[in-house]
Amino acid sequence: MTLLKTIFSWMPALVIAFLVMGCGGSGSSRQASAVLVDELGIAIQGFDPVAYHLVGKAVQGKAEYATQWNAATWWFFSKVNRQLFITSPEKYAPAYGGWCAYGIADGYAAETDPINAWTIHQGQLYLNWNAQVSTDWNADKAGYLKKSEPKWSTVQKQLQEGEATVHWH
């Protein structure tokens, strides 16, 4: 009977611990890779990376116009956009594998909001955590890029080895 009392006395603490481990932050069981993908391996939540450059807004891609590149599936709004990407993926794919540019500058990977937190700077697509972070990043692009460029190779290696600090929405 004493053993049962002990087990039940610890039960609330164990339940709370499991709940805390499963909520947000870097405690997520979601896998991280050098390219930010969803659970199905789709990059930038299925948004067409070429459309940001051509029409200046986030446009949802279609599975029927998908291609594989850099261990990720990329969706496009049209065959034309898919072909442009296939011809020059580095030109259209987001910097830092689609991870948050602001986070990379601080040495960690963070999920991004491809609808409200994106910028084209000097021909390169950058994504950020949310609209406010994107506004902050845009206020000092040069400063953040100076910090993030040398850190990306380290974060990228950590992502590939499963050792990166990752922040999920």
Regions found by a protein language model. Give the residues of each.
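Bacterial N-terminal signal peptides that target proteins for export
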Residues: 2-11
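Hydrophobic helical h-region of N-terminal Sec-dependent signal peptides
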Residues: 12-16
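C-terminal motif of bacterial Sec signal peptides marking the signal peptidase cleavage site
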Residues: 20-22
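Charged, low-complexity intrinsically disordered segments
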Residues: 24-169
